[in-house]
Design a protein with these regions (language model features):
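Acidic helix-start/capping segments at beta-turn-to-alpha-helix junctions
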Residues: 61, 100-117, 153-154, 219, ...
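A short, well-structured edge-of-sheet supersecondary motif
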Residues: 38-71
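Mid-domain, small-residue-enriched loop/turn segments at the edges of structured enzyme/sensor domains
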Residues: 53, 126, 147-199, 203-204
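Soluble periplasmic/extracytoplasmic beta-strand elements of cell-envelope proteins
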Residues: 55-59, 67-68, 84, 105, ...
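Active-site SXXK
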Residues: 64, 76-104, 264
C-alpha cells in the first residue's frame, strides 16, 4: 500500500469517527422522553380548549413518572369520592369491624333520588349485603346505596383513614343528594394529586392486604358508564369511578394496561357545558392510552410489533 493511499484511508476513518462522535444515537430513554413531552403538550392543548377548569394527574406505575395540571387544586368530586368510601369499607372489613356479607333491609326513609335500583326495591322486605350495596354504588352510582354505606362505616372513619395517608385535602363531608349541606358549602372534595395517591396506595397494597386489594380492584372495575372508559379499547379494564354534578365532570381510576398500568385522574369544573367536560375526559383518556400502549409494546428503539 502506497503512502498516499494509506493517508487517504486514515483521513476517511477519522472522518467517520468524527461523525459518530458528533451525532451519537439517542438512548432509548431519551426517545421515550420526547414522546412523553409531546403527550404533555397535547394535555395542555385539551386544557386550553376547555371552557372551564381542568385538573389532571397522570402516573406511570412502571417508571414512576408523573404529570399534573392544577394538581393541587381542591375540586368537587361528585361520585368520584365513592372511591374513598369503598376503600374504607374494605379496610373495616379487613379489620373485622364489619363483614361484606352483613345484611341490610331496605328502608323507605333511606331512599333518595339518583337511585335507579334502590328505588325499585320493596322497602321492609328486600335484603342486601354490604357487598351488594357497594356493587350498586360502583356500577350505577346508586346514591341510596352510597348513603347506607356512609352511615355504616361512618363519615369520620373515612376522613380518619384519609388523614392517616396524608390526604388532608380529600374530604367526605356530606351524604349524596344532601342539597342543604351542599348549599352550605359542605362539598365532597379532593385534588388530582391526592386522588392519584389514594389509588396508587391501594394498587401497591399499602392500605389493604393482598386479598382485599384484589377484591377492591375487581369491584372498582365493575362495568359502568364512564368517559375514561370510553377513551379505552373494550379489552382494557380500568378500576375507576366517574362523578357528575352541575358544571362538574370527573373520572379517576387505575388503567390496568398489560405491561404498563397507569393512573389517570381528570377533574373538570366551572363548565359552561357539561358535555365539554365529558369530551375532554374522553380525549385525555384516549391520548394517555395511545402513549402507554406504544411504550408497553415497543422495543428500546420504538419499534412496535403487533400480534397477528
Amino acid at each position: 500500500m502506497t503512502k498516499r493511499l494509506l493517508l487517504r484511508l486514515l483521513i476517511a476513518l477519522a472522518s467517520v469517527s468524527g461523525m459518530a462522535q458528533c451525532c451519537p444515537e439517542k438512548p432509548a430513554t431519551e426517545k421515550r422522553e420526547a414522546l412523553w413531552q409531546k403527550l404533555q403538550e397535547e394535555f395542555r392543548s385539551v386544557d386550553h380548549g376547555l371552557d372551564g377548569v381542568m385538573g389532571l394527574a397522570v402516573k406511570d406505575l412502571t417508571s414512576g413518572e408523573t404529570f399534573f395540571i392544577h394538581g393541587d387544586e381542591v375540586m368537587p368530586q361528585a361520585s368520584s369520592i365513592k372511591i374513598a368510601l369503598l376503600a374504607n369499607l374494605y379496610l373495616q372489613a379487613q379489620q373485622s369491624k364489619l363483614k361484606l356479607t352483613e345484611e341490610y333491609v331496605v328502608r323507605q326513609e333511606d331512599l333518595v333520588s339518583g337511585s335507579d335500583i334502590m328505588l325499585g326495591l320493596t322497602a321492609g322486605v328486600t335484603r342486601l349485603t354490604l357487598r351488594d350495596l357497594a356493587t350498586m354504588m360502583v356500577a350505577v352510582s346508586d346514591n341510596s346505596a352510597t348513603n347506607v354505606l356512609i352511615r355504616r362505616v361512618g363519615m369520620e372513619n373515612v376522613n380518619a383513614m384519609l388523614d392517616s395517608l396524608g390526604l388532608h385535602a380529600t374530604r367526605l363531608r356530606r351524604q349524596m343528594m344532601d342539597l342543604k349541606a351542599a348549599g352550605e358549602g359542605r362539598e365532597n372534595v379532593s385534588t388530582p394529586r391526592e386522588m392519584m395517591t389514594l389509588l396508587e396506595t391501594i394498587y401497591r397494597g399499602k392500605l389493604l392486604n393482598k386479598e382485599m386489594t384484589a377484591d377492591f380492584i375487581k369491584m372498582l372495575s365493575t362495568h359502568k358508564e364512564s368517559s375514561l372508559l370510553q377513551g379505552l379499547p373494550d379489552d382494557v379494564a380500568a378500576a375507576s369511578k366517574p362523578g357528575e354534578l352541575e358544571a362538574v365532570r370527573n373520572d379517576s381510576g387505575i388503567v390496568l394496561l398489560k405491561g404498563r398500568p397507569y393512573i389517570l385522574c381528570v377533574m373538570t369544573t366551572y363548565l359552561r357545558d357539561e358535555k365539554d367536560g365529558s369530551a375532554a375526559i374522553r380525549k385525555i383518556s384516549a391520548l394517555t392510552y395511545s402513549y402507554f400502549d406504544r411504550v408497553a409494546r415497543a422495543s428500546e428503539y420504538g419499534r412496535v410489533v403487533s400480534p397477528k
